[in-house]
């Protein structure tokens, strides 16, 4: 019985300790707007291999420049944009980023609403870096979101969250239409 208890305690510590190394941060805007934008740019800027993005509205030039620089360094970037918010938006980064080497862009609408001629939207604000970090929250990637809005941004390297985000991204990517 004593050996069983020792094994039980050791297993409990090991299972509990698996998540201890995870780095997570949450930012509330507008109070932490600069820290939030820096966290997003730094996370994207740390990419060595891949960046996967699903974004409703993306007009922020600072963030676009970070992606441009990573693509120039060979990072493969896939961006899913919401169709309605970006297709005819002259401020969207889709045309600029879609023209760059190592960046592929596509458009996604939400699901069709029953028998009606209406589609939902792709309302994600998600980035996955190297399959190791995930960033998500309420903020569109716009200047306004990071300067004036009440938004939230969450950054994590927790493996279970990253894997779940990658799976969701993969499902959206399969339905995405070329720009």
Task: Name each model-derived stretch.
Residues 11, 52, 151:
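Generic anion/oxyanion-binding catalytic loop in active/binding sites
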Residues 19-45, 69-179:
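HKD-type phospholipase D/PLD-like phosphodiesterase module
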Residues 44-49, 57-60, 64-65, 69:
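Helical hinge/lid and interdomain linker segments adjacent to catalytic or ligand-binding clefts
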Residues 11-21:
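Hydrophobic h-region of N-terminal signal peptides that target proteins for export
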Residues 50-55, 79-81:
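Short catalytic-loop micro-motif centered on adjacent basic/acidic residues
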């Amino acid at each position: 019985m004593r050996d069983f208890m020792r094994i039980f305690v050791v297993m409990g510590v090991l299972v509990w300790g698996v998540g201890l190394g995870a780095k997570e941060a949450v930012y509330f805007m507008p109070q932490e707007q600069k820290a939030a934008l820096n966290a997003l740019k730094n996370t994207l800027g740390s990419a060595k291999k891949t960046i996967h993005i699903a974004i409703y509205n993306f007009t922020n030039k600072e963030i676009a420049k970070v992606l441009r620089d990573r693509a120039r360094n060979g990072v493969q970037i896939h961006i899913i944009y919401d169709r309605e918010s970006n297709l005819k938006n002259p401020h969207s980064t889709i045309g600029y980023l879609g023209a760059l080497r190592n960046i592929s862009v596509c458009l996604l609408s939400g699901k069709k609403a029953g028998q009606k001629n209406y589609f939902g939207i792709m309302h994600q604000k998600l980035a996955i870096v190297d399959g190791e970090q995930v960033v998500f929250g309420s903020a569109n990637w716009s200047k306004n979101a990071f300067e004036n809005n009440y938004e939230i941004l969450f950054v994590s390297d927790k493996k279970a969250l990253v894997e779940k985000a990658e799976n969701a991204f993969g499902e959206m990517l399969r339905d995405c239409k070329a720009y």
